[in-house]
Structure formats: C-alpha cells, structure tokens
Amino acid sequence: MRRSILFAVGARAIRSLTAARSHRGRFPTLDQNSSFLGPEPRGKEARKWHIRDKRKLSNRLREFFIYSPALGRTVGVRVLLPGIPQEVSPVIHLYHGGGDDFRSWTDFGAAEELTLDSPYLVVMPDAGAGTYSRVAVGSEVHDWPTFHTKEIPEFLAKNFSVDFAPDNQLLAGLSMGGYGAMKYAAWHPDRYSWAAAFSSPLDPLSAVPAFDIIAMREGAKSMTLFGDPVADRNEWIANSPYGLAENLQGLHLWLSAGSGSLEESKDRDLLESMVNQQGERFSARLNSLGIRHSWFPRTTGLHNWISWERELGAWLKTLRRQRDYASSDHRSVERRGGDLERRGGSLEPSGSIVEDHDAPRPESTTVNNSDRRRGGPRVADGGEFSYLTGHALFDIHGWRVEISRRRAQIVCFGSVSAAGFSLTGTGSFRVRTPGLYEPGRRYDISVVGPTGTNDYPQRADKKGRLTFTGRLAAAMHDPIIPGKRTQHFTTVGQAEVTTVRIASAKNDEPAVKTTDVSDSAHVDAKSTATSVYGYNGHNIVTALRPSE
C-alpha cells in the first residue's frame, strides 16, 4: 500500500514538472530550449518539416533545429560529417537514452572522436523523454517513430549525399535509444541491415514500470503509452523488439550490457542489472529463432556514459572489420573478409575476437535479408519473405497492406512472393503488390480461408501491380460485444489463416489499355466495373477492367 502511494505521488510530481518545463518552452530532456526561435509555425507552414535554424559547431559537427509536423514542435538534430569523406555516405542513426537529448552523444559519449576515422554520416535526432513511440500528451500526439523513420531520412536526402540502400543504413542507441534502434529495425527490416543496442530494455512487457515512467516524463498519463499490459497485450507486443524478433532474421545485430557493478565495489546498479537480464532473454529468444547475433554480457559496467562510450567504440571496431572501407591508416578491409568474418565473430573492446551466437537455423523456405545478400532470390524480384506486425497499415518490400479491424492485433504477413501470401487476423484487407507482374496481363486471384474459396480475375496496372481486397478468416470471431466470443476470438480467431494465390491466367494477352486502379481517383468512363461476390454475398473486390 505504501509503495502504491509513493508511486502515485511520484507520478504526479513527474507530470507536474514536465508541464511546468513545457510552459517555459523547455522539454523533458535536459534544458533544450527553442524559445529563441520564436512561436512555433502554424497553418501551411506547419504542414511540412523544415529547418528553422542551423549552426556549425566544428569542422564535422552541425546542429539543426527542425520543425516536425509529426511532433507539432521544433526539436534539435546533430549531424557528424564522415571522418573519411565519401561521395555518397552510409548513415548511422544514433539514438540517445531517457533523460538525455540530441547533444548527449557528442557532449558525453565521444561520438565525434570515435567516428573520426570512419566513413559514416552520423545523425543524432532528439527523442524527447525517450519513448521512441507515439505518445498522447493531452490533446497532442508526439509521433516519434514518424519523425525518426520518415522525416529524418527526408531531411538527410535533401541536405546530404547519403546512401539509403539497406546495407548502408545502420541503427544504434543506448538504453531506451537501443530499444528504439531494435524496434525500428524490426518494424522496417527492408530498410536497415545493422542494429546495435547498448544497455537496453528490449522486452517492454517485462519492464512495464520503466516504460510507464518514461512516458510520464514525456507528459503522458500513467498506462497510456501502450495501454494496460494485460488488456492491451497486443499493443505492447507490436512495440516490442522481443515480440517482433522474427523480423530481425538476416540483420547484423549487436547487444551488450554491463553487470551492474564494478570490481572494486559491492554496490549494484539495479537498472544495468535489469537490462543485462533483458539482454540475456533477448539473446535466448534470437537463438530459439535461429537468428545470428552478437551478445556481450560484460563482467563489469554501470548504466553510465563510461560504459556506452566503450560499447560504441567496440561496435565501430566491428564495423571496421566487417564492412568495406579504408581505416585511418588507409589499409583496405576486404568486404566480409578476414579472421573475424571467417570465424563468424565480433570484437571485444580489447580487440580480441569472440564467437557470435550462431544458433542452428530452422528449416524454412523463407528467403530473408541474409539470404538475399548471399546470392539467394531477391525479394524485389519476388523472392519469398515473412513479416510480423501490429500495424493496421504497413509497407514492406514494396507491398502495401491495409487492414480494417476493430482492435489491435498481431498479423503475420507470411510466405510472401509473386505467387501469393497468407494473412492472419481479423477484419478485411486491401493489398497492393509491387511491380512484379506484366502490365495489362490478367491474373487469377484465389482467396482461400476457412469460410471457403473466392476466385476472380484481376489485371496488372501500368506499373505491373495488382490491387485487391478480401475478408480475413477470423472476422467471424470478432464480436462487438465483449464476452465468451471475444475470448474465443483472442485465443482462436487471430490464429486462423487466409491464403491468397496469384497465377497468370491462361490464354491471356495484355490489354491494349490498362487502368491504374491503385493510383487513379477516377475511372475512365469507358471502363466497366465487374463486382465479384463471395463469403455469403459480401462484396469482396471490384476489379476495374477496360471495355473490349
């Protein structure tokens, strides 16, 4: 009882402090103050991100203040230019932890010195209190993922010469920043190939109080970040690197954490001990999925900048050995060559090689990012992949999927290739494929589920894409009124699978004219709409085809 009272009083104090700092033009991280820029943009000016101020702090370090529509306010971003100049630079997205800000890695973590002999452009955006999530603060929503994964890449593309190929997009962070790095990697495995987490909580469901406190420092109310961990479990899993670990197959993963103590002291750093246990759990989870990774549970180390500076340096040494660029003494490192790669290991800060966790891979026909880099069928050419998500709208490897649903759920978009895919979950779906098909040619679509089979034709648009809709099998288990049927939906409905098969129609020639149904807001008057019905009379898809 006493602990509950103290926690409630502490929560109120955190919210009061955050509100007071916001009114003064300051945000929850240190003393970041943008009041010198004047009032925040309004109207048309607030619809797009834009640079409000920029400064040159050193030969390599630049500081920007950017207005973000996703956040509804101006935040800071620091950028380190490559130590080894490049015509087109790979990018490290380096994230700070809770209680820090965009200046912390250069002010306290020696990021500028550690990257002096590297080819990377390092971008260090602000992350508020460090939730790396959408946070409801009063009537506002701070959408940090959109700022980090959409607006920051647009900012980089417009102002710097950078390479956006997945192999040249790297994520790293300390504490909550490492959580953000792993989460973004799991959300977008088609956009990033490297991710590192130093002393990070990677399983939110086993660290609920920590995430709740971080959200309150942002100004949110208690238990509003992802909702109740029991009633809204799917929302927590959808934001969990641990829950979405299957998506990390084929990426280069680095995990590290200190023990929470020093050799000369018996005192324990409980926070570092907690993230060490989280790292152990996450490593075990990756092993169970057959995902290669590097896990370094240090024998000493606290939750502080001494440890994180060491870990960043160790990770950069690993990159120097595994990636193809010239080091400070101008000796080239052969791509994927040397003792490190042949032995499948990573570097300790001392420079010694330790073995990677290389769990046996489960038997699967799925082609992941790793297979693609090693010469297997490319996903862009129709190679197979699978993807786990909690989003109702997502884009992955050129596929765009929209799911209409009543509640949060975890969806498996599985066995995806030019020949079709499978979907789990409830509601209805709309899918637009990449340009894998011959423009104008007719294809036979077959939607197979527990309720039956629905077959209909569809023509590829001028970009070689197919667009179609359908009902998911579990829709019949998704009642509006809670009760036993709701429990049945939770335990059974979401596990049911709907399969879509795509095959080229026999004896069909491409049409002279095609209608791009996915991009056109209007249909040519000469086109006729053919409605195909199924699933007890419900309209499943309308295929628009030119009149003969």
Give the label of every model feature segment.
Residues 4-425:
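Non-catalytic cap/lid and distal C-terminal segments of serine-dependent acyl enzymes
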Residues 378-548:
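C-terminal beta-sandwich/jelly-roll accessory domains of carbohydrate-active enzymes
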